[in-house]
């Protein structure tokens, strides 16, 4: 999956909307960015907003907030719109103003719009961190479940990190693969000003463990005293991850 990082919100241009793309939003102005982008996609547009949050086991529980069309009081999602043959009569409701993201949830806007061809855009609002210790991202499941806000916040942000560095094992990637089965998206643009570490540093526990074991094996020698120091340091590091 190709990834681009934009450090300044104003760098997003209409040209960024000419191919199927995911925007991963870690900005202080996510709602403004979404409203600005969607205004460029009118008038032929179909959208669906989802909200998702992890349960105590880390499983993402997802529901639809709104969409362009309803049938029998049930929101139609983008895949259903495509399966129905892209009926323009279903492009009834224009996208709502972007929802604000709580610290324990993530909002996804799935958009299909037409300008010479159908193009699909995903806009993912990532919650801001409510923690200060970045090491929590390595294994969120060590955290207590009550109160739930911290566990959910760290878990969601670790899933976002996983989407960029080890997507096939990220629950967020699995969710997006379920949401998007046609008009496949292979490019992610990350938009942030103050959250670069989440999208530039890999926090995968498996990779940390592999690195630690490789380091440990490379340090062991015939020196018994030094080996004891290495073992103690290894145990200390292992306890933290």
Swiss-Prot record:
Entry superkingdom: Viruses
Pfam families: Pox_D3
Keywords recorded for this protein, A-Z: Late protein, Virion
Induction remark: Expressed in the late phase of the viral replicative cycle.
Chief place of localization: virion
Subcellular location: Virion
Gene Ontology CC: virion component
Role according to the record: Late protein which is part of a large complex required for early virion morphogenesis. This complex participates in the formation of virosomes and the incorporation of virosomal contents into nascent immature virions.
Family as reported in the entry's similarity comment: Belongs to the chordopoxvirinae D3 family.
Name of this chain's protein: Core protein D3 homolog
Species this protein is from: Rabbit fibroma virus (strain Kasza)
Lineage of the organism: Viruses, Varidnaviria, Bamfordvirae, Nucleocytoviricota, Pokkesviricetes
């Amino acid at each position: 999956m190709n990834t681009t990082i934009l450090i300044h919100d104003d760098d997003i241009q209409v040209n960024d909307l000419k191919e199927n793309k995911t925007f991963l939003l870690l900005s202080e102005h996510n709602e403004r960015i979404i409203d600005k982008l969607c205004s460029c996609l009118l008038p032929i547009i179909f959208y669906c907003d989802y909200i998702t949050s992890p349960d105590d086991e880390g499983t993402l529980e997802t529901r639809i907030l709104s969409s362009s069309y309803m049938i029998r009081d049930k929101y139609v999602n983008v895949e259903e719109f495509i399966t129905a043959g892209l009926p323009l009569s279903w492009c009834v409701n224009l996208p709502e103003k972007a929802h604000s993201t709580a610290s324990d949830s993530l909002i996804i806007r799935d958009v299909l719009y037409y300008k010479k061809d159908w193009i699909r855009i995903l806009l993912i609002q990532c919650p801001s961190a409510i923690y200060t210790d970045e090491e929590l991202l390595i294994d969120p499941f060590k955290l207590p479940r009550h109160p739930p806000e911290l566990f959910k916040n760290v878990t969601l942000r670790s899933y976002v990190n996983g989407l960029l560095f080890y997507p096939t094992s990220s629950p967020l990637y699995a969710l997006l693969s379920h949401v998007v089965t046609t008009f496949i998206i292979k490019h992610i643009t990350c938009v942030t000003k103050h959250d670069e570490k989440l999208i530039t540093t890999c926090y995968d526990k498996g990779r940390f463990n592999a690195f630690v074991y490789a380091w440990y094996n490379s340090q062991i020698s015939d020196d018994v005293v030094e080996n004891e120091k290495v073992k103690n340091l290894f145990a200390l590091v292992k306890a933290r991850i």
